[in-house]
Structures are given as C-alpha cells and as structure tokens.
C-alpha cells in the first residue's frame, strides 16, 4: 500500500510520450492540464483532480483521470512508479 510519504517516479510508454509531445506542440493549455494532473497523481495516485477511477475489463489494474470531456490519462501504479500509457481519447484507441 502506498503512503502519503511515498515518492513515485513517472514513466511513459512510447505511445504516451508521443501523445504528450503532440499536446506540447499543438495545445499548450492541454499540456499544462496534463502536467497538473501528473503532479497531482504523484501526490495522490487514487484520489484528486480529474476524477480518478479504476478501469475494468481489459484495462483492469489501470486507472484513468479526465483531461477534458474527450481525452483521458490512463496510468498504472506500482510501489515505485506511475506509468502513463495513454493521454489521448477515451481508454481504447
């Protein structure tokens, strides 16, 4: 179980990193929103902004947070790391 004092590292899958770079290039407002949500996720992986929710079915074990009405951040959490797997669209591409 994660405690409040745990400091988690962030990693991106290759696809998620490309999506982040695309947001950085095309939509600075969304980039700032993503950065804010990532920072909050580091502090509180399962609560906080973006309405965190555990995913089900083929994405069981992952969590999502709303970036806006169309896009979600999908991520997994271990005892040492938050891995971001998706930053565009709604769960499945």
What is each model feature region?
Residues 37, 51-58:
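Short secondary-structure junction/hinge motifs that connect adjacent elements
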Residues 1-9, 15-32, 49, 56, ...:
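Enriched for short, Lys/Arg-rich terminal
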């Amino acid at each position: 179980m994660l405690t409040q004092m745990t400091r988690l590292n962030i990693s991106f899958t290759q696809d998620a990193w490309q999506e982040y770079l695309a947001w950085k290039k095309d939509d600075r407002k969304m980039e700032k929103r993503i950065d804010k949500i990532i920072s909050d996720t580091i502090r509180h992986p399962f609560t906080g902004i973006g309405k965190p929710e555990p995913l089900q079915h083929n994405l069981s074990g992952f969590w999502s947070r709303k970036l806006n009405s169309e896009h979600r951040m999908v991520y997994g959490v271990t005892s040492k790391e938050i891995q971001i797997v998706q930053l565009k669209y709604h769960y499945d591409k």
